[in-house]
Amino acid sequence: MEISLLNIIACPLCQGQLLLQEQELVCQIDALAYPVRTNIPVLLVSEARNILVK
């Protein structure tokens, strides 16, 4: 995924900043990790993984 894309996309839930970590885009505000599949970010809340440790 192109790093310049990170400057124009945002979390679909809170419109916060997304951080690229491995093959995921992480929203630290919502504690969600959105997958990146074949260099395409999947910014669907239903596809996001909760990253909170319980």
From Swiss-Prot:
InterPro entries per record: Trm112-like (IPR005651)
SUPFAM superfamilies noted in UniProt: Trm112p-like
Family designation: Belongs to the UPF0434 family.
Protein name: UPF0434 protein BCI_0256
Highest classification ranks of the organism: Bacteria, Pseudomonadati, Pseudomonadota, Gammaproteobacteria, Candidatus Palibaumannia
